[in-house]
């Protein structure tokens, strides 16, 4: 899967800013709490492709994305405005994120974790990171980036 060190390096600041929103939503909407991070990964990849000199220097890229239309509508904002998706890609992306979030949630629930513990928190953050990276990879692939083996020598 395509990846970028710049996008990966943005993870700590994205996660720190996202966690208060994600944790608040997890109780009532756990799949949303997970899935929205995949959208954020897609948006960060799109920003990386468009103008990383600007977006890469934003101190809180997540808040920039969220505050455009709010947390609840962030998925639609990212698909419509950031990624500029039209039907059918708009709907297919929604289905992909929903499936990934639900499968991740199912795997998380199968873990022998006590809610409210450090271990449960760490597992949640690990899931968010994977979804962020998956979202970035999906968008980089959509933008026709491909990973290739390099021959040195």
List each model region and its residues.
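Intrinsic-disorder/low-complexity detector
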Residues: 1-153
């Amino acid at each position: 899967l395509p990846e970028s060190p710049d996008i990966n390096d943005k993870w700590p600041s994205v996660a720190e800013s996202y966690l208060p929103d994600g944790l608040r939503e997890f109780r009532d909407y756990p799949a949303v709490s997970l899935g929205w991070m995949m959208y954020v990964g897609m948006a960060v990849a799109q920003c990386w492709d468009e103008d990383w000199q600007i977006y890469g220097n934003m101190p809180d890229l997540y808040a920039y994305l969220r505050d455009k239309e709010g947390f609840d509508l962030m998925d639609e904002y990212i698909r419509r405005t950031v990624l500029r998706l039209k039907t059918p890609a708009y709907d297919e992306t929604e289905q992909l994120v929903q499936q990934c979030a639900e499968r991740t949630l199912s795997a998380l629930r199968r873990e022998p974790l006590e809610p409210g513990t450090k271990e449960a928190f760490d597992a949640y953050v690990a899931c968010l990171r994977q979804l962020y990276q998956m979202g970035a990879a999906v968008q980089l692939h959509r933008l026709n980036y491909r990973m290739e083996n390099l021959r040195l020598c």
